[in-house]
């Protein structure tokens, strides 16, 4: 995620071209540069919240979008603590949405990053 590069690209785009954030930690900043939304790993775990954040920004409630972005940062960090999609699969398994099955070359998370992910899920209100 390079905000300066995104600004350069946004300047070059025609009005009919849509730019999307691919970096969960930068969705709101990139929307301020003209991104229409996001292609998100975070949304795999909190789809409604990510939708609400983008919708708030598009509706002009930048403060609400910013607050959601900032509040989501601990979970975003945890979701990128190991190679994608391992943490998101682990998160969904902990939430009871899928079984924790991994095919090569994927493997279970390390104990320390799994514990940090669990803490982030609890902090986000997704686990008891």
Where are these regions (language model features)?
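Surface-exposed charge patches
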Residues: 28, 90, 119
């Amino acid at each position: 995620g390079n905000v300066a590069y995104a600004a350069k690209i946004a300047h070059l785009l025609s009005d009919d071209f849509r730019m999307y954030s691919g970096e969960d930690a930068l969705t709101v900043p990139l929307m301020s540069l003209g991104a229409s939304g996001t292609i998100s790993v975070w949304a795999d775990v909190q789809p409604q919240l990510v939708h609400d954040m983008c919708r708030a920004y598009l509706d002009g409630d930048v403060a609400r979008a910013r607050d959601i972005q900032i509040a989501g940062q601990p979970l975003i960090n945890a979701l990128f603590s190991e190679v994608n999609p391992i943490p998101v699969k682990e998160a969904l398994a902990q939430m009871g949405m899928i079984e924790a099955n991994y095919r090569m070359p994927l493997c279970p998370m390390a104990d320390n990053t799994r514990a940090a992910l669990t803490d982030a899920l609890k902090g986000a209100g997704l686990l008891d």
